[in-house]
Structure formats: C-alpha cells, structure tokens
Swiss-Prot record:
Organism taxonomic ancestry: Bacteria, Bacillati, Actinomycetota, Actinomycetes, Pseudonocardiales
Name of the gene: pfp
UniProt site (Important for catalytic activity): 124
Record-stated family: Belongs to the phosphofructokinase type A (PFKA) family. Mixed-substrate PFK group III subfamily.
Family annotation (SUPFAM superfamilies): Phosphofructokinase
Name assigned to this protein: Pyrophosphate--fructose 6-phosphate 1-phosphotransferase
EC class (word): transferase
Domain of life of the native organism: Bacteria
pH dependence: Optimum pH is 7.5 for both the forward and the reverse reactions.
Entry binding sites for Mg(2+): 103
Pathway: Carbohydrate degradation; glycolysis; D-glyceraldehyde 3-phosphate and glycerone phosphate from D-glucose: step 3/4
Keywords: Cytoplasm, Glycolysis, Kinase, Magnesium, Metal-binding, Transferase
UniProt cross-references to PROSITE patterns, sorted A to Z: PHOSPHOFRUCTOKINASE
Described function: Catalyzes the phosphorylation of D-fructose 6-phosphate, the first committing step of glycolysis. Uses inorganic phosphate (PPi) as phosphoryl donor instead of ATP like common ATP-dependent phosphofructokinases (ATP-PFKs), which renders the reaction reversible, and can thus function both in glycolysis and gluconeogenesis. Consistently, PPi-PFK can replace the enzymes of both the forward (ATP-PFK) and reverse (fructose-bisphosphatase (FBPase)) reactions.
Activity modulation notes: Non-allosteric.
Length: 341
C-alpha cells in the first residue's frame, strides 16, 4: 500500500512530529510506502512529491515548520482540481491520503472523501479553534512563546512606565490571547468573541498607572471594538476567502496614548508564534495523532479525523470536525476578568 501525507495551511511546531510518526508506523508496522506531497494541496494537484523513508524523518522531531512545505492552495478553486488529484494519485499508485491541517485543509479533505478519495485528517492549528478536538498541536507552543514575550516586555514596560499592547494571533478565537494573557499576568485581555469598549480598556489602564504599575494589554488580532470592525493588514483574500488581519494592537496603543497622555507601545508577535521548536506537549500530541492516523488508514476509516478527548485519541467524522469553530465561551473569559485593571 502507498499512502500520501501532506501539510496544508499555516505552518506550526509539531508538523514534522506527525510526519515522523506516520512514516515510522506506516513502514515498520504495515510495510507501506509513504509519499510526501509538497506544498499542501498543491502537491496532489501537480504531482510534486517525494518518497519518505525512515532516514528522512530521523532528525525532524524537534524541528519546527514542515519538511514538506505548505500552502493555502484550494483544489476546489482550480478548474478540474478534483480530477487532477485523482489522476495524480492513480499515476503515483497512492491509495490513501493523510492530510494535516486546520479548518480549510480539513474542509478540502472532507469534500475529497465525498468525491470518493480516501482521506484521513489530522488537526493542526495554533489557534486551537477546532471544535471536535480538545487541543490541537501547535497551540501549546504558541502560548509558551507569547507568554515568554509578555514576561520580557513587562520589564521594559516597567522600566519606562509605559503601557505595552501585545498583539497575538487569533482570527476568530481568542484562545492564545486568553491563555498567554493569564499565564503572563496581563492586566487586560481582548478576544474576538467579546467586542471591547475602548473606554473600559482606558479605565483599566489608568487604574494600573495610578498604582504606579505599567499595564500589559494582550489583544488577539481578530478582536474588535464595540461598533467597529476588524483591522486589516490587506484587503486581499486567499484561496479560502480569508483576509490578512493585523494592526489592532497598534491602533489600540495609539488610542491609549491619546486618551491617557501616557506613553504606549504596541508589539505584534506575528509569525514568531508559528516558529521554532515545539514544546514537549506538542511533540507528544503530534506524535500520537500521527500514529492514530495510520491506524485509521489501516482500518479503511476514511472521512475521519483523529482528535483528543480528555487523554484519549479518538476518531470523529470530518463533517463534524469542520462544522463549527471552538471559540472562547463567556464563562472562560469572565474567569480572567477578575485580573483586569
């Protein structure tokens, strides 16, 4: 049996750990040939692939990024995309695919399964916003990176007695902002799920200044002010219809400075949250996902995604996995509010 594996969407720490697990178990437990498709769904569209043997994955566990490359290619936006993939798989003798990605990559996997192509999904997103799994790998590393940045920024903020606004990733879900903000002792946390009042933020900030402390504000890139809209870096859309967010941190820092008369700075963590070595937790979770994805392929259980429920790895239908996003519930945000101001 020949099994293909690909990584789609934004990169994140832990992708190589999944690939390593798929190759090791696929070859050693089943005697399969493993084919790595390059650049996400672009690989199966164009036939761009490489064989993956045990030596190819020997040293990749601790590496960030993905040895296969990634892209935001959407085969359903390509003329004859499905038939091109079907032809490539037939030409290369690939019997099944393991697709590692977030909502967009898994959405394509679900459609391909409906079109008769055998696909098993592995959830990947630093945003942790897939509802069918308790956690996705990459999230823990992103929170760790953001928390460390907050710790470092606090000392410079205190030295200059200024407000520091830290913008983190999170288009629709504020899990990184919530977890990193709590772990870093932020004085204000702003998430996409809760439109914020600029007046309230300023009140919290001034309360900190009155106590001679430098306030730390953590804001997700998708957070919006009441009655406002998302701040866009560019209006251009990718193949899945997403615009590029960014800039709410700078906008808010300017508002704070203007309304308080105090110095305020914005720091956008950006792609540092996606890079570098995965945490131990993400390495283990990604490895377990890869092992169980191989089991799903061996069982012919296509149209499913491996997921974490409690401490167990289970399988869920791709239709369930892509039906909705997991956003921060009101009660979780309210837990953090006791620390605001």
């Amino acid at each position: 049996m020949r099994v293909g594996v690909l990584t789609g969407g934004g990169d994140c720490p832990g992708l190589n750990a999944v690939i390593r697990a798929v190759v090791r178990k696929g070859i050693e437990a089943h005697g399969w040939e493993i084919v790595g498709f390059r650049s996400g769904w672009r690989g199966p569209l164009t036939g761009d692939s490489r064989p993956l043997g045990l030596d190819d994955v020997e040293e990749i566990l601790i590496r960030g990024g993905t040895i296969l490359g990634s892209s935001r290619t959407n085969p359903y936006k390509e003329e004859g995309g499905v038939e091109k993939i079907r032809a490539v798989l037939a030409d290369q003798g690939v019997d099944a695919l393991i697709a590692i990605g977030g909502e967009d990559t898994l959405g394509v996997a679900k459609k391909l399964t409906d079109d008769g192509i055998g696909v098993v999904g592995v959830p990947k997103t630093i945003d942790n916003d897939l509802a069918a799994t308790d956690y996705t790998f990459g999230f823990d590393t992103a929170v760790h990176i953001a928390t460390e940045a907050i710790d470092r920024l606090r000392t410079t903020a205190e030295s200059h007695y200024r407000a520091m606004v830290v913008e983190v990733m999170g288009r629709h879900a504020g899990w990184i902002a919530l977890h990193a903000g709590l772990a870093g002792g932020a004085n204000v946390i702003l998430v996409p799920e809760r439109p914020f009042s600029v007046e309230q933020v300023v009140e919290w900030v001034e309360r900190r200044f009155e106590k001679m402390y430098a306030p730390i504000i953590v804001v997700a890139e998708g957070a919006v002010p009441e009655g406002g809209a998302e701040v866009l870096r560019t209006g251009e859309k990718d193949a899945f219809g997403h615009v590029q967010l960014g800039g709410v941190g700078t906008w808010l820092a300017d508002e704070i400075a203007e309304r308080t008369g105090k110095e305020s700075r914005a720091v956008v963590l950006g792609h540092t949250q996606r890079g570098g070595t995965p945490t131990a937790y993400d390495r283990v979770l990604a490895t377990r996902f890869g092992l169980h994805a191989v089991d799903a392929v061996a069982d012919g259980d296509f149209g499913t995604m491996v997921a974490l429920r409690g401490t167990d790895i289970v399988r869920v239908k791709l239709a369930e996995a892509t039906a909705e996003l997991k956003t921060v519930p009101p009660e979780r945000y309210e837990e953090a509010e006791v620390f605001f101001g």
